[in-house]
Amino acid sequence: MKIVIQRVKSASVSIDGKIKEKINQGFLLLVGVEDADSNFDLDYAVRKIAQMRIFSDEADKMNLSVQDIQGEILSISQFTLYAETKKGNRPSFSAAGKPDFAKAMYEKFNDSLAQIVPVKAGVFGADMQVELINDGPVTIILDTKEARKNA
C-alpha cells in the first residue's frame, strides 16, 4: 500500500458537486493498493497511521497522534499513486491493484482504522473533488512495501 498522509485543519470530498463527507482537524489519506498487498500491509498501515505523532503538543513539538487530538480521517482511494512514468508521456497504472482486490483492501483498511479513529471515506472508483486546508503543511508518504521487505 502507498498512502499519502496529509495533516489538515479540514477536508471534504464531493461527488457530482455535492459534499459527500467532510472532517475537521485530522488526516486526509490518499490510499493506493497493489496486488502484492496483504493483511500484513493493511495492519502495518493502520497501526502506523493511528499512532503517527505529527500534531503539535503545547511545546509546539510534533508529539501527538490523531487519536491524541481526537481528530478524524478522510480516506480517499487513489490508484494513481502507482503511476509508472518511465516510458512516454502518458502514465501507466498497471502496477495498481486490480479493482475488485483494491476495493476490498481499501474498505477493509477503512473499517480497521475506524475501530481506532473516526473515518469518513470517498467512493472507490468515483470521480471525486477533494478540498483541504493543509496544516503546516505536513505530508508523509507511507509505503508498506518497505516494511514487508524487512518483515
From Swiss-Prot:
GO biological process: one example: D-amino acid catabolic process
Motif Gly-cisPro motif, important for rejection of L-amino acids: positions: 136-137
Entries under SUPFAM superfamilies matching the protein: DTD-like (SSF69500)
E.C. no: 3.1.1.96
Catalyzed reactions: glycyl-tRNA(Ala) + H2O = tRNA(Ala) + glycine + H(+); a D-aminoacyl-tRNA + H2O = a tRNA + a D-alpha-amino acid + H(+)
Location in the cell: Cytoplasm
Main subcellular localisation: cytoplasm
GO MF annotations in UniProt: D-tyrosyl-tRNA(Tyr) deacylase activity; Gly-tRNA(Ala) deacylase activity; Ser(Gly)-tRNA(Ala) hydrolase activity; tRNA binding
Superkingdom in the source lineage: Bacteria
Gene Ontology CC annotation, any one: cytoplasm
Keywords from the UniProt entry: Cytoplasm, Hydrolase, RNA-binding, tRNA-binding
PANTHER family: D-AMINOACYL-TRNA DEACYLASE 1, D-TYROSYL-TRNA TYR DEACYLASE
Domain commentary: A Gly-cisPro motif from one monomer fits into the active site of the other monomer to allow specific chiral rejection of L-amino acids.
Record-linked NCBIfam families: D-aminoacyl-tRNA deacylase (TIGR00256)
Biological function: An aminoacyl-tRNA editing enzyme that deacylates mischarged D-aminoacyl-tRNAs. Also deacylates mischarged glycyl-tRNA(Ala), protecting cells against glycine mischarging by AlaRS. Acts via tRNA-based rather than protein-based catalysis; rejects L-amino acids rather than detecting D-amino acids in the active site. By recycling D-aminoacyl-tRNA to D-amino acids and free tRNA molecules, this enzyme counteracts the toxicity associated with the formation of D-aminoacyl-tRNA entities in vivo and helps enforce protein L-homochirality.
Assembly and oligomerization: Homodimer.
Family note: Belongs to the DTD family.
Protein name: D-aminoacyl-tRNA deacylase
Organism: Lactococcus lactis subsp. cremoris (strain MG1363)
Taxonomy of the source species: Bacteria, Bacillati, Bacillota, Bacilli, Lactobacillales
